[in-house]
Amino acid sequence: MLETILTTIYVYFASPLGLVELFGTIFSAICVYLAIKHNMWTWFFGALGVILFGYLFLQFGLYSDAGLQILFYLPMQLVGFFMWRRAAAKAETKSVVLALTLAQFALICFGIVGAAGVNGYLIATYTTGASFPYIDALTTWMSIAAQLLMIAKYRESWILWVAMDVIAIPVYYVKGMVVVSGLYVVFLVLATMGGIAWYRDYAEQNPNDTTEPGPGGEA
């Protein structure tokens, strides 16, 4: 049994797509870990993972995810690098973490659902071979919002990452992308750790803020 499993893993990762998935997984995991630490190298490893996963998603018919990787994530790695570098140059201590109000966060969530509904309908209506168009669109727009919030250093970005990971894990598993599904389990753990770390950083930077931790960190 063990020999069969090991043989299957070896054969999979020896294939071209298997290698793409493996290295994309490694680079992406490093990217998330460095983001938790406010390390600007996160954007370099993020760019490597984006390129590999963009290609991989195209092969599996996940067109929204592929477009997200190449048309949004890739340029955002450059934007994120320069914004974090500029913020680091201005900050005298640890990178400043910001917080949204409850109303702001709720508005963003409503916007995500609305955009995903329209996007999913267009994919389902005008494309062929798309897998899980509405769920694919939802994770796409959640990722876009989370990425923008992360670039701007809002702690709520991690809430969206956690929610997106929870949705993505079964989708990729059903699609047969077992390693990617496993990667998102790791991402889920890292995103949870990231949220805890950034909320703690915010509390340390704002000791007079007595609001309860959560999406509405500021009143």
Residue ranges of model-derived segments:
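Membrane-helix interface "capping/anchor" motifs
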Residues: 33-44, 148-160
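Short, strongly hydrophobic alpha-helical membrane anchors
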Residues: 1-19
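Helix-coil boundary and interhelical linker segments in multi-pass alpha-helical membrane proteins
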Residues: 2, 55-65, 122-129, 173-178
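Membrane-water interface of transmembrane alpha-helices
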Residues: 71-89, 199
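Membrane-proximal helix-loop-helix units in multi-pass membrane proteins
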Residues: 84-142
